[in-house]
């Protein structure tokens, strides 16, 4: 334990996701000990981000405008919507340069343990978007964990009432991974999702 404001800094940094007590302490001391670290600039950027960044009115992605750049892009296909849990998932998919449709960010996943149900997610907004007959396919790209699977199952049932194609991202072995380290579920999915060689 440190005194006063130093401990407050460590505590506040530790509240960030993925930052444990040791990492928070390391970051705090980096800020304190590095002369070149511009604390004022960091504080300014944090304040500006909080004031300027919002969620896209259409898809829920982060944006500095009412709608995000992807939703405004006329080159994107409005026929396909990829449903993801968080805005960071949009960034991950965009890095592949494989998807040219639009997104819908749920804002999380169904997790009864955490008290998150379907009404806590942006599912109603997704249904409103599907009322427009332009959409022909919904790709469910939730995480391949219990919460993501629960969300995907819930969405699949809900979307079965629409005359659209509903697909789920394939999951299986990562490129460069070793079979011996793969868990049973991952291996099972890899077998289920196998395809003919040459496809």
UniProtKB/Swiss-Prot annotation:
One function term, GO molecular function aspect: zinc ion binding
Keyword Zinc: yes
CDD domains, sorted: TOPRIM_recR
SMART domains reported for this sequence: HhH1, TOPRIM
Zinc finger (C4-type): 56-71
Domain Toprim: 79-174
Taxonomic superkingdom: Bacteria
Pfam families given in the database record: RecR_C, RecR_HhH, RecR_ZnF, Toprim_4
GO BP of this protein: DNA recombination; DNA repair
Keywords, sorted A to Z: DNA damage, DNA recombination, DNA repair, Metal-binding, Zinc, Zinc-finger
Family: Belongs to the RecR family.
Functional description taken from the UniProt entry: May play a role in DNA repair. It seems to be involved in an RecBC-independent recombinational process of DNA repair. It may act with RecF and RecO.
Name the record gives this protein: Recombination protein RecR
Organism in which the protein naturally occurs: Clavibacter michiganensis subsp. michiganensis (strain NCPPB 382)
Species lineage: Bacteria, Bacillati, Actinomycetota, Actinomycetes, Micrococcales
């Amino acid at each position: 334990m440190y005194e006063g404001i130093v401990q407050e800094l460590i505590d506040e940094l530790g509240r960030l996701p993925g930052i444990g007590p040791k990492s928070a302490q390391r970051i705090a001391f980096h800020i304190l000990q590095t002369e070149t670290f511009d604390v004022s600039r960091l504080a300014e950027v944090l304040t500006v981000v909080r004031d300027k960044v919002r969620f896209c009115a259409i898809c829920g992605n982060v944006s500095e405008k009412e709608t995000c750049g992807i939703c405004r892009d006329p080159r994107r296909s409005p026929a396909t919507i990829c449903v993801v849990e968080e805005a960071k998932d949009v960034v991950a998919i965009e890095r592949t340069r494989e998807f040219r449709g639009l997104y819908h960010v749920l804002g999380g996943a169904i997790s009864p343990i955490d008290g998150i149900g379907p009404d806590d997610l942006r599912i109603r907004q997704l249904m409103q978007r599907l009322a427009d007959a332009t959409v022909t396919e919904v790709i469910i790209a939730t995480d391949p964990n219990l919460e993501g699977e629960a969300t995907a199952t819930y969405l699949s049932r809900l979307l079965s009432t629409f005359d659209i194609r509903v697909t789920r991202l394939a999951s299986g072995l990562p490129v460069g991974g070793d079979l011996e380290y793969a868990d049973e579920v991952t291996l099972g999915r890899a077998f289920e999702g196998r395809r003919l060689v040459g496809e």
